[in-house]
Every structure is written in C-alpha cells, then in structure tokens.
C-alpha cells in the first residue's frame, strides 16, 4: 500500500467494487443517491429562501410577497428536511443490510475456490487482513458507499453553489462607487475565483496527507485489533471458561491486553493521531476558514459599492462558503479514494484467486450395481509450500464392495490419502483411476457424488437436525430418520420433542439443543448414510465415542454399508477386525497390506506392533502377570 497509486487505477478499482456491491444489493445505491441529493441541496434551499426574505425586508417590505416567501421557504425546507429524515432511515437500514450481504462475496469465493487454495495459510492470512482492515479503519469494500455519498454530495454542493453565486461575480458595481468599480474587472474576479479554488484544493490535500498516514500503521493496527478481538472477548467463550478458572489464565490475558499499546497515546498510532494526522487535518480546516474571509470581504465590498442588496449578501456568503467546503471535501475524498484503493487491491487479490484444478467433462457412470473401482498408481503428493512428501509412491486398488481399513501413526499420510481420493487435491506424481480412467477427466461435481465422507474435523451447522443430515432445506424425512437410527442416534432423536426439526445449538434459537461430541459424530455419520453414495469413508469417525459405542457403530456399518465400498481410518485397531483388508501407512508410504490375521502373523511388522501396544490396555491380566 506504500506504492504510488495512480488516480486512474484508484477510480477503476472503486468502480469494480461498487459494481460488486450493487450485485449483492441492488437497492442501496439508488436509495443512497436520492438521500445524498436531498441532503446536499437542503442547505442551499435554506440559504436561498433566507436571502429572499431578507431582501424583501430590506427593500420593498410588501406583506403579501413576504408572506409568500415565508410560506414557500417553510414548505420547501420542511419537505426537504422530512424527505431527508425518511431517506436517511431507509439508507441506513440498507447500509446495515449491505454489510451482511457483502460477506456473501467472500463466502461464494470460498465455496467456489479450489480446496487446495482454501487450505493455504496465505489465503487465510489474506482474508484475515481484509477483515482486520475493515474492522480497525473501515477501509475496503464498505468504504466505497461512504466515498460515493461524500463525493456525490460534494459535486452537488459545488453545482448548487455555482448556481447561487454566479450573480455575485456578474453583478456590476455602479460607476458612482469610485475605486470599488475595480471589482468589476474580469481579471480580478478570475484571480479571486482561482485563489478560492486553490485554497480549497490545498485544504483537501492536507486532509489527504492526514489520511495517508493510516496506511503506514496498517500492520500495527491490524495486530492490535487482533489482540483486542481475541483477548477482549475470550471471557465470553463458553469453551474456555473452565480452563481460564482452573489455570488463572485471566492473568495471562491481562498481561497481553495491557502490553498492547498501539492505540494508546504512547503507541505509534496514538502518536501519529496526536501529531501529523491531527495537525494536517486541523491545518486543512483552518485553511478553509480563509475562503470564508475572502468571500466576506469580496461580497461586502460589492454590496457597499451598490452591486446588490443585503439579502443577496446572505445568499452569496452562505452559498460561496458552502461551495468552498464542498470543493475541500471533494479534494479530500479524491485522496481517500487513492488510499482506499490499496485496501481494495487486497480484497480483489482474494476474490481473483484463480481455480487452477483441471475440470474434466466426463460423467461418472450411474451404476445400480455400484461397480466402481479406484486405483492409486505410483501416487506421490506434498502440500503446497512444503518440501517433504506427505505420500510417496503409493499404489493401491480398492476391491469393490469390500471394507478397507487404513491405519498408521499420526502424520503417516492417512488423511492425505483420503483427500486425494476425494480429489480435494491433485497429486504431483502418479495418477488415480476410476474404472481405469484418470479421475481428473471426470466432471468434478459428478465425481464428488460417488463419495460419502465423515472427516475427523467435520462440522455441523446451527440449523435443524434433519437439514444437517440431508444437507438441504427440503429432504426425505423418513430417509433422514432411518439414517439417524442406523448411526445409533435413535434414542436421542426419540427424546427430542421437535424430532428432526430440533435446532442444533443456540446460535439462532433459544430452544436450540447442545449435542455432545459423540452425538455430533453420530449425526455426521447419519449425514454420510443419507447421501447413499457408492463409496463411504470414515476418517476417525468414532474418536469421541466410547469403545462399546464404537464397536456397535462398526458392527452396524457392516450391515448398513451393504454393497458399498467402505474405507475406515481409525487409531483404534479393534475396528480393523470388521474389515476385509488393512493398509498400514508409515511416513507417507504403504508398508503393509493384508487381512487382520495375516498382518498379525507378521510379528515384526508395524501392524502387529501397533496392535499389541493397544491390546495391553484391554487384555485382562492375572495378579501375578500384573506384578511381573
């Protein structure tokens, strides 16, 4: 943001931002335009009618004319004031709505973005930076409506001022005024108008200079705002309450809270606000006052010379001063436009992240017999930005309709294997085949439909239970109920008065139901069953369940999965006994593959090592054995 910003680029990026905001809220800008126009002309309406009333009082004093001017002034001013108030409420309501709708731009981008980019830390950091910019300084997308309203108001103010002051310059001083006739010289008038404009521009430049300092402290402000956002509300987080009390973490929170002084008087931001930012801003305001002085002197001299009456003095002074203020604000907004453009660049860097994953066009064959065969052929993969391989030369073929267990220590590549299978990532080496065809050649959405997955870090929404299971607002209630029953959630479902309509969690409903980790896992499993895909994948799906509940789930799954191909990932090797084949991962490679009994027979193998390490905690020992 410290790079020189061209006005053309700044204008272009703001037009794009306005177009994006108009796309999510088509009523805001028309409403804001109407409100701004009415608000901008209201001061000039007051000035105009005040001048006419004073003129009549000072000159002819005709009661009927005076009455008409008063009535017209009251009516016009009142109508404009009422219209402004009504339009203000409407515009503010739409602005609040726009704040929420603006987030859909980022949501839609996340939804359509390649998962590989969603998973990148750089992407998360960029999105956080955009949010922090908006939180601490309001720069970014939501600065665009403000710039639009202020710029439009300034332009209307300038045009209105010109309309009301044009006769200030064209009304001649009578020849009888002597030396004051010099005020009629076009060159003098041109110089005066030029000086007023230059002073207004200078004031705007000073305000622009003050605003430019904010981008210099963006990094400090962002960090400080993160500290505030995290530590300022940590006590309200119900999941942290117990730890805070058990370990006196409030002392640690206070330490970091008090240690951050970026916004304090002694911090960098505070020093700038009290120093150059405040200084330049005050200087700009002071410079504008010079214009008022010039206007008063010029207007009074012409009135003294007899160019116009006292009523016109009121009109010219008020209109010229307001016009100069509009020029000042317009110049300041043009500077703000350039400052905000840097923040908008960050926004569009995020929104313009390209989808680089190849999108095929083949459709996956809809087979009633579920005869899909998947093969990993010499597949190697490493995460973006990493030099170490997460998977190395993995080759494996899934037997259709069988149960495959994938085991291994943490970091061995199990979850990465599943992400590649679901094509959340593409491998750097090798290929993955579906019925003999590279999966990259299939239509992506079509390919995804053949998998039902329960990830270990699954998420449920704060929505009705049935909608969580179906992933849709419209769904088959009988099918959703059966899926929950098959997943072992039947007893809990029966205890819910609203059944499938029970709202999960209390984010949006006071009568929302909190579910335990184990219950949430059962709902996630039910969601996978409801999809009824040919492949069902469970990545640590029972980590929050006790061993008995886990065994029940796996026993049911053998019956539930039917002719589906099922893949299990679990640290509890007891689940492997339900599977037809087991693949053992270590350091990104498949080092063993076979049945439970066959792998146990390999006493020096990794599987036997893991099995016996867990079995000792479940094997009943005699007192003598325990002592030994």
Go through each PLM region and give its residues.
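Helix-to-loop junction immediately C-terminal to a conserved catalytic motif
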Residues: 422
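Cytosolic ends of transmembrane helices, especially the final helix of ABC transmembrane type-1 domains
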Residues: 295, 313-353
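Extended non-transmembrane interhelical loops and adjacent amphipathic helices
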Residues: 1-15, 96-142, 223-269, 341-354, ...
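Transmembrane helix-loop-helix hairpins at lipid-water interfaces of multipass membrane proteins
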Residues: 30-83, 157-211, 306-310
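Membrane-integrated ABC transporters
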Residues: 1-41, 64-68, 87-91, 123-159, ...
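C-terminal portion of ABC ATPase nucleotide-binding domains
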Residues: 498-499, 555, 562, 572-628
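ABC ATPase nucleotide-binding domain helical subdomain, centered on the C-loop/LSGGQ "ABC signature"
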Residues: 431-433, 448, 466-510, 554-555, ...
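ABC-fold ATPase nucleotide-binding domain signature/coupling loops
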Residues: 433, 490-523, 532, 617-628
């Amino acid at each position: 943001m410290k790079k020189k910003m061209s006005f053309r680029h700044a204008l272009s990026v703001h037009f794009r931002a306005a177009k994006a905001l108009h796309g999510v809220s088509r009523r805001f800008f028309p409403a804001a335009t109407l409100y701004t126009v009415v608000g901008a002309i209201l001061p000039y309406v007051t000035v105009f009618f005040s001048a006419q009333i004073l003129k009549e009082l000072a000159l002819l004093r005709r009661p009927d004319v005076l009455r008409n001017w008063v009535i017209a002034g009251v009516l016009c001013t009142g109508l404009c004031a009422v219209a402004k108030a009504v339009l203000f409420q409407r515009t503010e309501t739409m602005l609040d709505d726009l704040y929420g709708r603006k987030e859909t731009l980022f949501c839609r981008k996340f939804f359509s973005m390649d998962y590989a980019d969603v998973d990148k830390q750089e992407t998360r950091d960029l999105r956080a930076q955009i949010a922090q910019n908006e939180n601490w300084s309001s720069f970014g997308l939501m600065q665009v409506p403000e710039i639009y309203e202020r710029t439009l108001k300034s332009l209307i103010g300038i045009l209105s001022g010109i309309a009301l002051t044009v006769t200030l310059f064209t009304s001649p001083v009578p020849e009888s005024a002597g030396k004051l006739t010099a005020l009629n010289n076009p060159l003098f008038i041109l110089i005066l108008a030029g000086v007023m404009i230059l002073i207004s521009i200078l004031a705007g430049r000073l305000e622009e200079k003050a605003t430019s300092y904010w981008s210099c402290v963006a990094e400090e402000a962002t960090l400080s705002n993160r500290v505030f956002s995290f530590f300022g509300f940590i006590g309200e987080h119900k999941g942290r309450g117990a730890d805070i009390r058990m370990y006196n973490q409030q002392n640690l929170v206070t330490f970091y809270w008090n240690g951050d002084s970026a916004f304090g008087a002694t911090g960098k931001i505070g020093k700038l606000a009290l120093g150059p930012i405040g200084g330049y801003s005050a200087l700009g305001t002071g410079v504008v006052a010079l214009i008022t002085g010039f206007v008063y002197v010029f207007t009074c001299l012409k009135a003294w010379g007899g160019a116009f009456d006292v009523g016109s003095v009121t009109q010219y002074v008020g209109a010229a001063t307001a016009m100069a203020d509009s020029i000042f604000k317009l110049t300041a907004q043009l500077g703000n436009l350039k400052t905000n453009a840097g923040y908008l660049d960050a926004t569009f860097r995020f929104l313009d992240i390209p989808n680089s994953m190849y999108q095929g066009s083949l459709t996956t064959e809809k087979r009633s017999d579920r005869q899909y065969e998947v093969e990993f052929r010499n597949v190697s993969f490493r995460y973006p930005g990493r030099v170490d391989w997460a998977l190395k030369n993995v080759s494996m073929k899934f037997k259709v309709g069988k149960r495959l267990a994938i085991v291994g220590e943490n970091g061995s590549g199990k979850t990465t294997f599943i992400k590649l299978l679901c094509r959340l990532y593409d491998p750097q080496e090798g290929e993955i085949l579906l019925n003999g065809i590279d999966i990259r050649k299939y239509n992506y959405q079509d390919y995804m439909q053949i998998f039902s997955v329960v990830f270990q870090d699954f998420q449920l929404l704060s929505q009705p239970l049935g909608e969580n299971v179906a992933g849709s607002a419209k769904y088959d209630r009988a099918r959703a109920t059966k899926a929950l029953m098959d997943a072992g959630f039947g007893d809990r479902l029966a205890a819910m008065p609203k059944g499938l309509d029970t709202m999960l969690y209390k984010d949006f409903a006071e009568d929302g139901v909190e579910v335990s980790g184990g219950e949430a896992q059962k709902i996630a499993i039910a969601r996978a069953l409801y999809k009824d895909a040919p492949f069902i994948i469970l990545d640590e799906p029972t980590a929050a369940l006790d061993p008995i509940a886990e065994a029940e789930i796996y026993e049911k799954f053998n019956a539930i999965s039917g002719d589906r191909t099922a893949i299990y990932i679990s640290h509890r090797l007891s689940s492997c006994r339900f599977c037809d084949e087991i693949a053992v991962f270590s350091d990104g490679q498949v080092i063993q593959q076979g049945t439970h009994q066959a792998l146990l027979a390999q006493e020096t193998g990794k599987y036997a090592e893991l099995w016996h390490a867990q079995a000792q905690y479940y094997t009943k020992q005699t007192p003598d054995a325990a002592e030994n």
